[in-house]
């Protein structure tokens, strides 16, 4: 196989196309993490790439998303910067290398999937004012080194490049940019570069919380090994709530009043309440992903979808929906 040209070696294996979610966080605080968790539940990305996490070793343990394994690279010595790659815990992933200096933050991982070509993913942050030449040299050198070590691997390079001139780097490594829209105001700072021809262009999602960078979604072919379970829940909506309130107000509670003992009254109370609930908020068996956070409710997901629809249609209502989404998240977390 050593005599087979590199391009032919890559074609000999089926490419692995994970679904990838990316955003520049500008501080991965709790509110942004919660909305990111909602996005993860809706879009089910296999990989989440984050730039400008603004974390350190002490804070990373509190920044976990259920069902994902974390790979962090923190900026040393000062606030800001930092990158992370989160991979679904059903994926075989190995961290290859990372680099953090005063000018760049970068982390590289390799994903192995049976019968597919290995996939190397890099998440990089090139801050404003950093040396373009230094970053380009780092990218070129690291990509070449990893390509030589893993000759059948394919690449996804994503991050905030802050207008870094990447034309020569892309041409040398046969990389195509899949981001065709502005990612922060009127600038395209965040990119997804790949040599996998089967990918379609990235999709634009609304920013998380009060962020000013949009999210990028790269739709792929996810593994079919996600674990689901059936759970029993009461179906509650605004209509059923009103009916429930009315039923409670009109209930005579005769069974409770007629009971002769304390235990009898408690039992009658429970039976009456159970009957009212079964009438107006019946139980249903529903399928959900195992270990799904209980605070990510159907209403939270519905509002998040509406926010993204408004954002992509350039409707001004998305800001109001974004504020509503934040209020719902906080309320749901308190319950």
Question: Where are the regions a protein language model picked out?
Answer:
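Generic structural motif
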Residues: 28, 89, 114, 128, ...
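Metal-dependent phosphoester-hydrolase catalytic domains
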Residues: 95-104, 162-243
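Arg/Lys-enriched, amphipathic patches
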Residues: 119-124, 154-158, 162-164, 219-335
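A composition/secondary-structure signal for short, hydrophobic, low-basic-content segments
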Residues: 4-5, 209, 266, 322
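Amphipathic alpha-helical interaction motifs in eukaryotic regulatory proteins
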Residues: 37-41, 87, 140, 144, ...
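Short amphipathic alpha-helical interaction elements and helix-loop-helix interfaces
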Residues: 42, 54, 92-93, 115, ...
């Amino acid at each position: 196989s050593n005599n087979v040209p590199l391009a032919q070696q890559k074609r000999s294996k089926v490419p692995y196309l994970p679904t990838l979610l990316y955003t520049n966080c500008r501080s991965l605080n709790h509110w942004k993490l919660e909305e990111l968790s909602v996005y993860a539940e809706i879009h089910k990305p296999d990989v989440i790439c984050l730039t400008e996490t603004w974390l350190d070793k002490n804070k990373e343990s509190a920044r976990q998303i259920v069902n994902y394994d974390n790979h962090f690279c923190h900026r040393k010595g000062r606030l800001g910067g930092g990158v992370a790659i989160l991979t679904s815990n059903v994926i075989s992933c190995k961290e290859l290398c990372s680099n953090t200096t005063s000018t760049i933050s970068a982390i590289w991982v390799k994903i192995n999937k049976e019968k597919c070509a290995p996939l190397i993913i890099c998440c990089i942050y090139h801050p404003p004012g950093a040396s373009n030449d230094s970053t380009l040299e780092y990218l070129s050198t690291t990509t070449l080194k990893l390509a030589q070590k893993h000759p059948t691997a394919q690449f996804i390079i994503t991050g905030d490049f802050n207008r870094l001139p990447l034309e020569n780097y892309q041409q040398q490594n046969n990389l195509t940019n899949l981001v065709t829209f502005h990612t922060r105001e009127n600038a395209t700072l965040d990119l997804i570069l790949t040599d996998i021809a089967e990918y379609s262009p990235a999709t634009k999602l609304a920013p998380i919380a009060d962020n000013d960078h949009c999210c990028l979604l790269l739709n792929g072919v996810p593994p079919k090994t996600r674990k689901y379970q059936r759970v029993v829940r009461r179906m509650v909506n605004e209509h059923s709530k009103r009916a429930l309130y009315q039923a409670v107000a009109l209930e005579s509670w005769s069974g409770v009043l007629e009971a002769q003992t304390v235990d009898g009254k408690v039992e009658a109370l429970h039976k009456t309440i159970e009957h009212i609930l079964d009438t107006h908020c019946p139980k249903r068996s529903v399928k959900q992903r195992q270990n799904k956070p209980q605070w990510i409710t159907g209403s939270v997901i519905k509002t998040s979808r509406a926010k993204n629809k408004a954002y992509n249609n350039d409707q001004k209502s998305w800001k109001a929906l974004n504020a509503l989404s934040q209020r719902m998240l906080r309320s749901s977390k308190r319950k």
